[in-house]
Curated annotation (Swiss-Prot):
Keywords: Ribonucleoprotein, Ribosomal protein. One of its GO terms (biological process) is translation. GO terms for molecular function: mRNA binding; structural constituent of ribosome. Homodimer. Part of the ribosomal stalk of the 50S ribosomal subunit. Forms a multimeric L10(L12)X complex, where L10 forms an elongated spine to which 2 to 4 L12 dimers bind in a sequential fashion. Binds GTP-bound translation factors. GO terms for cellular component: cytosolic large ribosomal subunit. Belongs to the bacterial ribosomal protein bL12 family. It comes from Idiomarina loihiensis (strain ATCC BAA-735 / DSM 15497 / L2-TR). Forms part of the ribosomal stalk which helps the ribosome interact with GTP-bound translation factors. Is thus essential for accurate translation. The gene is rplL. Gene3D superfamilies: 3.30.1390.10, Single helix bin. This is Large ribosomal subunit protein bL12.
Length: 124
């Protein structure tokens, strides 16, 4: 009686990890292949696509001022250079974009500053 693919897969599924490693090594020797080479060749193609899709500009959105509105206003003023009246109007009109088209590092830093002031912030 010949083994089916399902029989082989079920047997492999029940094997401990160390036995699987030994099985892979034996298969590599028997058939003259290297399993890691196929993985290494496929990885850069996937990584290249991910890099092409990665965003480079981010928007920092103030979703809510939080419990301490005065601290949020001060943080917005410091980040944007707006006057007190403009910063207060921005905080009170949340959700609003505080800064648009900034780098990831700058967006994360601004988010951290606003959250420390008690504001609810999102980076898009």
């Amino acid at each position: 009686m010949a083994l089916t693919k399902d029989d082989i897969l079920n047997a492999i599924a029940e094997m401990p990890v160390m036995e699987l490693v030994e099985l892979i090594e034996a298969a590599e020797e028997k058939f003259g292949v290297d399993a890691s080479a196929a993985v290494a060749v496929a990885a850069p193609a996937a990584g290249g696509e991910a890099a092409a899709e990665e965003k480079t500009e981010f928007d920092v959105v103030l979703k809510a001022a939080g419990a301490n509105k005065v601290s949020a206003i001060k943080a917005v003023r410091g980040a944007t250079g707006l006057g007190l009246k403009e910063a207060k109007a921005m905080v009170e009109s949340a959700p609003v974009a505080v800064k648009e088209g900034v780098s990831k590092d700058e967006a994360e830093e601004l988010k951290k500053q606003l959250e420390e002031a008690g504001a609810e912030v999102e980076v898009k």
